[in-house]
């Protein structure tokens, strides 16, 4: 497993972990972080930080999955369209601006109405044993509504895009090497990826940066 911590300034850190959950978070910045955490829906993350915003890119993908697998239902498309509208409204804000309270209230009312629609549709078309993701998503979106819509109230990102980009790059690399033979190999890859990504974020020449790293003299033994 690879744990990725990314900041709004574009910096990131990758950690090799044998386990998910609290054991995977131990020793990472998240363990002591007190700010707002932007994350996918892993309930473990709710034990850390002071506030939470679920990554809406994940939610949009899950909604698309429901649309593809449950074409007889309408709630998922309505919710996807609403989320796109909310994101567009936030993107249109100028620096220091915030959404009007009435606009936010309208978004939240429509969110509730769509979740009520989902309840009615699943009563009429119960989820099958082969696909329950849409049903579970609707229940989850109601239970974690505050974390889903925090970005309407506060200046927080609505997606963890930096972590997503790094994760995609790392997954492509894993496909190339097939598998890491040891945790040590995965740890080395995480350290190297952390260094390279942060050099790029700072606008540094990656080749020169890595050359400086390898040119360092190891400290003398104590």
Regions found by a protein language model. Give the residues of each.
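Catalytic center-proximal scaffold of phosphoryl-transfer enzymes
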Residues: 1-222
